[in-house]
């Protein structure tokens, strides 16, 4: 038994422009060294570019892209009888959102390294790709699903 107390979840205040907690979490993922204003400029700029390209509202694009990237299943390592199995488990809502935000950020950062574009443009492209069920973040989700499908035989070792 752990002697520590369970860490309490911090309440994140919604962002100033769209009044969304999810967008505030995304800004926190992108933020480096506490430079919130720079992260906000990047996110709001990418969303406004996506909005002008598609003609839909920025929040609907962001939420649709997030829903397309959020995983429902993942594999967890479970050691039983000296053998480690990759056991497929369902992903909790909060973890699914965190993974989706992180994957969109990583895919945009990888695209930034490959090309000479600004990060704002790469983030806009990645959001549009996720919106259309393509791109690096969606690929990461599909890899999780493939792993879960391949290890379906070990699903009876689920965590209690």
Swiss-Prot record:
Gene3D superfamilies: Ribosomal protein S7 domain. Part of the 30S ribosomal subunit. Contacts proteins S9 and S11. Pfam families: Ribosomal_S7. Keywords: Ribonucleoprotein, Ribosomal protein, RNA-binding, rRNA-binding, tRNA-binding. Belongs to the universal ribosomal protein uS7 family. This is Small ribosomal subunit protein uS7. PANTHER family: RIBOSOMAL PROTEIN S7. It comes from the Bacteria. GO terms for biological process: translation. SUPFAM superfamilies: Ribosomal protein S7. One of its GO terms (cellular component) is small ribosomal subunit. GO terms for molecular function: rRNA binding; structural constituent of ribosome; tRNA binding. InterPro entries: Ribosomal_uS7, Ribosomal_uS7_bac/org-type, Ribosomal_uS7_dom, Ribosomal_uS7_dom_sf. One of the primary rRNA binding proteins, it binds directly to 16S rRNA where it nucleates assembly of the head domain of the 30S subunit. Is located at the subunit interface close to the decoding center, probably blocks exit of the E-site tRNA. The lineage of its organism: Bacteria, Pseudomonadati, Pseudomonadota, Alphaproteobacteria, Rickettsiales.
């Amino acid at each position: 038994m752990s002697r520590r107390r369970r860490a309490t979840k911090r309440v994140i205040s919604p962002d100033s422009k769209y009044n969304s907690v999810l967008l505030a979490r995304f800004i926190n993922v992108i933020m480096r060294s506490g430079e919130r204003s720079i992260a906000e400029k990047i996110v709001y700029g990418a969303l406004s570019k996506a909005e002008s390209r598609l003609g839909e509202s920025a929040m609907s694009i962001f939420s649709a892209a997030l829903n397309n990237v959020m995983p429902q299943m993942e594999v967890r390592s479970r050691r039983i009888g000296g053998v480690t199995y990759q056991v497929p488990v369902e992903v909790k809502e909060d973890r699914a959102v965190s993974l989706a935000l992180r994957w969109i950020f990583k895919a945009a950062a990888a695209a930034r390294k490959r090309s000479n574009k600004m990060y704002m443009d790469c983030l806009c492209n990645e959001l549009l790709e996720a919106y259309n069920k393509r791109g690096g973040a969606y690929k990461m989700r599909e890899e999780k699903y493939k792993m879960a499908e391949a290890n379906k035989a070990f699903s009876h070792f689920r965590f209690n």
